[in-house]
Regions:
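Phosphate/NTP-binding elements of NTP-utilizing enzymes
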Residues: 1-173
Length: 173
């Protein structure tokens, strides 16, 4: 029997799924049925890493569903999330046209996608059904963005899934 050989890209992706140390509050958060979860936790508390993994698992497991990740600016969301999400979603296995560097979108073969959005222009989130997502650094987002842009996107009715209610994590310190 020969040993399985992995490419350097595969190894990087697998290493990115390192084991996390579970904290009781993090486990409570993950188990909570709340639709909107406000997570005011200190720096280095693991909130962003937990969210990255939650959304990566959902986009891989839930077919035909668009997800979003947002931060106050496009530069911020790209810096905090883009490289990690490409690793967590094993994008090296996808055709090149499934990853859009200009749109900051990952499209998976199951029909689901993750789009990174800068909320310096919160209208970017409007007009599409969102299955779920999260906003990092929520305290720095424009005060009107939740009511005028984010909440309506989460409440967009999808006739193919009439009972589904989109979820959102709001992360901050």
């Amino acid at each position: 029997m020969t040993a399985q050989k992995f490419s350097p890209a595969q190894i990087r992706c697998m290493q990115r799924w390192y084991p996390l140390k579970d904290h009781p509050e993090q486990l409570r958060l993950l188990a909570s049925p709340a639709r909107f979860k406000v997570i005011p936790a200190g720096r280095r508390s693991g909130k962003t890493e937990r969210f990255k993994r939650k959304i990566a698992k959902d986009v891989l497991a839930v077919p035909d569903s668009p997800f979003f990740i947002a931060a106050p600016t496009r530069a911020q969301v790209k810096k905090i999330y883009w490289e990690d999400m490409k690793l967590l979603c094993f994008t090296h296995l996808l055709p090149r046209d499934c990853v859009s560097e200009s749109e900051l979108t990952i499209r998976l073969p199951n029909g689901s996608s993750i789009t990174l959005i800068g909320l310096d222009q919160p209208q970017r989130i409007e007009g599409t059904f969102c299955a779920g997502g999260g906003v990092d650094e929520i305290a720095d987002v424009k005060k009107t963005a939740w009511i005028e842009n984010i909440s309506p996107a989460l409440d967009t009715y999808n006739p193919l899934r009439p009972d589904y209610r989109a979820w959102c994590w709001l992360l901050g310190v």
